[in-house]
């Protein structure tokens, strides 16, 4: 069991680093606050457009597909981190770790197959996997009253 003095003696460098980093950030923020200019005009809240008057709204509507791509990136990035951690400790984990990683990869592949099957990865609506029954022209032509039946 280590005493408080031993813990402090062991971690003093990290404490100094942490205090220095927080102090430096605070010093930069205070310096910017005191040395920065103050705009008191009406144009203070208008974005700077390189000397050109801004036209229209700055808000832009993005397609939900971009959000899906961002979520997929985060999901697969976290999965890559797990696999990297496993690959670093492959000797310590042995066959049990290999089996766990294989199951993890199979679950990921099942999720990817599911995303492909529901069409979540399709960018165009024409390529979606939904089956829509298209009415045939012959069916409508035969039911039209002006077209004679054979």
UniProtKB/Swiss-Prot annotation:
Can you state the subunit structure given in the record?
A: NDH-1 is composed of 13 different subunits. Subunits NuoA, H, J, K, L, M, N constitute the membrane sector of the complex.
Subcellular location, in the record's words? Answer: Cell inner membrane
Supply the enzyme class, top level: translocase
EC annotation from Swiss-Prot or TrEMBL: 7.1.1.-
Q: Name one GO cellular component term.
A: NADH dehydrogenase complex
Q: How does it sit in the membrane?
A: Multi-pass membrane protein
- Ranges annotated as spanning the membrane: 14-34, 66-86, 96-116
Protein name, UniProt field: NADH-quinone oxidoreductase subunit A
Q: Does the keyword Transmembrane helix apply?
A: yes
Q: Please explain the role this protein plays, according to its UniProt record.
A: NDH-1 shuttles electrons from NADH, via FMN and iron-sulfur (Fe-S) centers, to quinones in the respiratory chain. The immediate electron acceptor for the enzyme in this species is believed to be ubiquinone. Couples the redox reaction to proton translocation (for every two electrons transferred, four hydrogen ions are translocated across the cytoplasmic membrane), and thus conserves the redox energy in a proton gradient.
A Pfam short name: Oxidored_q4
The UniProt record lists the keyword Membrane: yes
Q: Name one GO molecular function term.
A: quinone binding
- Which classification does the entry list for the species? Bacteria, Pseudomonadati, Pseudomonadota, Gammaproteobacteria, Enterobacterales
**Which keywords accompany this UniProt record?**
Cell inner membrane, Cell membrane, Membrane, NAD, Quinone, Translocase, Transmembrane, Transmembrane helix, Transport, Ubiquinone
